[in-house]
Swiss-Prot record:
Keywords: Membrane, Transmembrane, Transmembrane helix. This is Uncharacterized protein HVLF6. It comes from Human cytomegalovirus (strain AD169) (HHV-5). GO terms for cellular component: membrane. Residues 11-30 are annotated as: Disordered. InterPro entries: Bax_inhibitor_1-related. The chain crosses the membrane at residues 58-78, 88-107, 117-137, 145-165, 171-191, 196-216, 248-268. The keyword DNA repair does not apply. Pfam families: Bax1-I. It is found in: Membrane. It comes from the Viruses.
Length: 281
């Protein structure tokens, strides 16, 4: 006897579909919070301090090499006697350090590491450019320029440290820096000088003021260095080149007002004679 089986609720010959697998609900993402212990914070502070000591030690080495070479050039009895060459040589000597400063800033923006060979090339070229100042002017002028530029660099570094370590005085320092340039312009405007003398000194003061702001920014970059960055030798050498070039350009700009009694009359007379020769030929 044949037994016939019936499928209840489904037609014959139809395969039963399996329900789609249901995955269990995924747990919420775990937020990883990095907890910096006191020992790690102390270790990073010590590492940052040692990095800054090496940084400023490199800058002091570069500056000392430049000063020593300039003193050797000052001891040479020969001096540049041609008025036009003596008056314009410091200006041409400023162009090379400015170009090197722009290249160092380009390296900083691109995060390119500095090398020891690049530091030596920077120091050699800049030292040659600065040492020519010792062949153009008296020793007293060069010494005064070094002292005044060093005081300005130390003052800018001190302001940067105050802005970094004392948040309450930051607004006062910014206000002081904002009002300083108009006060200097007003001081130049009330002097009984020739118009070209006022224009040249106003431009020089503006460049020195802008360089002070740049030096403060570079110092703040050093002080606010992120702990996540590795303190490599390449970053140290690149930053040292920036600070060194700031100090050199500050010295070259300070030379202009200190040598004003020397080159203002001669240079103005030379320009007047050249203009008269060109327009009344």
């Amino acid at each position: 006897m044949v037994q016939i089986q019936f499928h209840q609720g489904e037609p014959l010959g139809h395969k039963k579909e399996k329900p789609p697998p249901v995955s269990p609900p995924s747990p919420p993402p775990i937020r990883r919070v990095t907890v910096i212990t006191k020992d790690e914070d102390t270790l990073r502070s010590v590492q940052h301090f040692l990095w800054m000591v090496r940084l400023y030690g490199t800058v002091v080495f570069q500056t000392s090499a430049t000063i020593a070479t300039t003193i050797l050039f000052m001891l040479i009895p020969w001096r540049v006697t041609a008025p036009y060459l003596r008056d314009t040589l410091p200006f041409w000597s400023t162009l090379l350090p400015c170009a090197l400063r722009c290249h160092a800033y380009w390296l900083e923006r691109r995060r390119r590491p500095g090398t020891l060979m690049l530091v030596m090339v920077y120091t050699t070229l800049t030292t040659i450019s600065v040492s020519t100042i010792g062949l153009c002017f008296d020793r007293t002028v060069v010494i005064q320029a070094y002292v005044l530029s060093s005081m300005l660099c130390v003052w800018c570094t001190g302001l940067a440290w105050l802005m970094a370590w004392n948040m309450q005085r930051r607004l006062a320092i910014l206000c002081l820096l904002s009002f300083m340039l108009p006060i200097l312009w007003l001081f130049i405007a009330v002097q009984s000088w020739e118009p070209y003398q006022r224009i040249i000194l106003a431009l020089t003061v503006s460049f020195i003021y802008g360089l002070k702001i740049v030096l403060i920014r570079d110092t703040l970059t050093v002080l606010y260095r992120s702990p996540s960055n590795c303190y490599t030798d390449g970053d140290l050498l690149r930053t040292a080149m920036l600070l060194y070039m700031d100090q050199v350009i500050m010295f070259l700009l300070v030379v202009v007002p200190l040598t004003a009694p020397i080159w203002y009359p001669n240079y103005a007379g030379a320009l007047g004679r050249t203009a008269h020769w060109l327009f009344h030929k």
